[in-house]
Amino acid sequence: MGMRITHLGSGSRGNSTLLCSGGTRVLVDCGFSLRQMESRLHLVGVEPQSIDAILVTHHHSDHSRTAKRASEKWEATLHANLETATKMGWQPMSECRTFGGLDRIGISDDLSLLPIPVPHDDADNVAVIATNGDGRRAAIVTDLGESTVELNKHLIGCSHISIEANYDSKR
């Protein structure tokens, strides 16, 4: 079983990455308008209602803009760490499943996610290591200011590593 990684967009106007493994579909970040998200998913042949989960890496709007609305409309489970959920005003458990750093999230037998805290201008940013049912791993790292020993340790053995490192704290 393979894992498909599709970058739907990356930049200050929005970020989102689609992970597919077996029958499981997960969005890492949902930072575009709902119409743009649906359009981008359709462009890659994915029905928005087939999304199983949305994981938000941090609270900045270019990563989180429509995550809650999309999760409600598509009936996808919303995941964020407690700091992000609090900053977004999402109610843990009723509106959002919260996780701690390095708490593995089992989405299905086909896909699990491991959030890894990474430095950014706010303390709530996480990278994501996705593992499929065959044990293949992929890393999605956004807004990385600098790497950490913990992140480097988890990047070893990944068959795909995507790093967005265009963040500038002086801008």
Predicted regions mapped to residue ranges:
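Short amphipathic alpha-helix with an adjacent loop that forms part of the alpha/beta core around
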Residues: 41-45, 104-109, 151-154
